């Protein structure tokens, strides 16, 4: 009997040690990170959907009923506008309002700043180097998704980010049967906005997280610039196991497991490309799409006055698996 008690006590202590060693998942305890799939963020910084997470007095953000409380700015943070000014935004996305660009007049600095207020950890976590790299990485990845540049384009190919708004060609409806995220009649879930979010199973949880019904109104991502930026920031800040969030990677919070190291997934910009589209672009040696992302990143780091860091490529990384965007590329 004493042995049983000792074993039970040991198990309990081991569980508590594991819990204490785990990093919080959301809210002010996690740099303003948001819970995935519409889960509530508890006052202690954990994601869930029971009363302990969502109930009055227990929920700090993404709570049911009413507006989402804004977590306080995390330590080491600060005003996003002090890192990227309106003039820098215009310099980075120099040709976004070119007459040839579908997104002319849509993507604005004010819309970006307003959207970022819903994700207070973005661009405000860590030291100045981490903050600048996050902004450079976010705009590099989204610029690749929306680029209108070409090799001999005026000012170079990396001055043409945010040219496109909707997926080009003749996209399908991207509707996958789902009981949780059912497709609305007549709606299409092709790529839209900075990150080109696609599929009903992404529009659904994204809409829930930002407080908009995107299943019934997917084109809000292409008609409301604040919602458009929020869709990209939601993707950026949201982890999808086994993948970390892009945010956690670029600020240095993510630490690779033994499995990640065996797959050559080491902290740096390359892992973010793996998160976004690793199934098609990573582990293939030199890939022009990966190099395009890196080209944008290097340019934006130069404008922001920060070094790009290490591990920019994913050519020798094994993929995490299918990304949110893999079927749209």
Curated annotation (Swiss-Prot):
Induction: By ethylene.
Keywords on record: Carbohydrate metabolism, Chitin degradation, Chitin-binding, Disulfide bond, Glycosidase, Hydrolase, Hydroxylation, Plant defense, Polysaccharide degradation, Signal, Vacuole
Entry-linked SMART domains: ChtBD1
Molecular functions per Gene Ontology: chitin binding; chitinase activity; endochitinase activity
InterPro entries: Chitin-bd_1, Chitin-binding_1_CS, Endochitinase-like_sf, Glyco_hydro_19, Glyco_hydro_19_cat, Lysozyme-like_dom_sf
Residues carrying 4-hydroxyproline: 67, 69, 71-72, 74-75
CC per GO annotation: vacuole
SS bond list: 26-41, 35-47, 40-54, 59-63, 101-163, 175-183, 282-314
GO BP of this protein: cell wall macromolecule catabolic process; chitin catabolic process; defense response; polysaccharide catabolic process
EC number in record: 3.2.1.14
Pfam families named in the record: Chitin_bind_1 (PF00187), Glyco_hydro_19 (PF00182)
PROSITE patterns assigned: CHIT_BIND_I_1 (PS00026), CHIT_BIND_I_2 (PS50941), CHITINASE_19_1 (PS00773), CHITINASE_19_2 (PS00774)
PTM notes: The 4-hydroxyproline residues are not glycosylated in this plant vacuolar protein.
Function: Defense against chitin-containing fungal pathogens.
Organism of this sequence: Nicotiana tabacum
Annotated TM spans: none
Active site, per annotation: 145 (proton donor)
Recorded superkingdom: Eukaryota
Family the entry assigns: Belongs to the glycosyl hydrolase 19 family. Chitinase class I subfamily.
Protein name, UniProt field: Endochitinase A
Subcellular location: Vacuole
Proregion span(s): 323-329
Signal peptide: 1-23
Enzyme class of the recorded protein, top EC level: hydrolase
Lineage: Eukaryota, Viridiplantae, Streptophyta, Embryophyta, Tracheophyta
Record domain Chitin-binding type-1: where: 24-65
Catalytic activity line of the entry: Random endo-hydrolysis of N-acetyl-beta-D-glucosaminide (1->4)-beta-linkages in chitin and chitodextrins
């Amino acid at each position: 009997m004493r042995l049983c008690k000792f074993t039970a006590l040991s198990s309990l202590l081991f569980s508590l040690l594991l819990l204490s060693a785990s990093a919080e998942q959301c809210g002010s305890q996690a740099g303003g990170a948001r819970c995935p799939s519409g889960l509530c963020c508890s006052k202690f910084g954990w994601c869930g959907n029971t009363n302990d997470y969502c109930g009055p007095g227990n929920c700090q953000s993404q709570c049911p009923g009413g507006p989402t409380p804004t977590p306080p700015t995390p330590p080491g943070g600060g005003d996003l506008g002090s890192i990227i000014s309106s003039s820098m935004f215009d310099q980075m996305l120099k040709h976004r309002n070119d007459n040839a660009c579908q997104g002319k007049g849509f993507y604005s600095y004010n819309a970006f700043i307003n959207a970022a207020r819903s994700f207070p950890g973005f661009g405000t976590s860590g030291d100045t180097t981490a903050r600048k790299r996050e902004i450079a990485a976010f705009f590099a990845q989204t610029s690749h998704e929306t680029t209108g540049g070409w090799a001999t384009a005026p000012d170079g190919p990396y001055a043409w980010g945010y040219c496109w708004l909707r997926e080009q060609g003749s996209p399908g409806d991207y509707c996958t049967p789902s009981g949780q995220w059912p497709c609305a009649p007549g709606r299409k879930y092709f790529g839209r906005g900075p990150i080109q979010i696609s599929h009903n199973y992404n529009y659904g949880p994204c809409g829930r997280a930002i407080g908009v019904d995107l299943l019934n109104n997917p084109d809000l991502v292409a008609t409301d610039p604040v919602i458009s930026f929020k869709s990209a920031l939601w993707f950026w800040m949201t982890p999808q196991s086994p993948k970390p969030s892009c945010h956690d990677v670029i600020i240095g919070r993510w630490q690779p497991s033994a499995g990640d190291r065996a797959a050559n997934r080491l902290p740096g910009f390359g892992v973010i490309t793996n998160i976004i589209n690793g199934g098609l672009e990573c582990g293939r040696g030199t890939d022009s799409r990966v190099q395009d992302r890196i080209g944008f990143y290097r340019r934006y780091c130069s404008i922001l006055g920060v070094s790009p860091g290490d591990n920019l490529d994913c050519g020798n990384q094994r993929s995490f698996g299918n990304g949110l965007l893999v079927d749209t590329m």
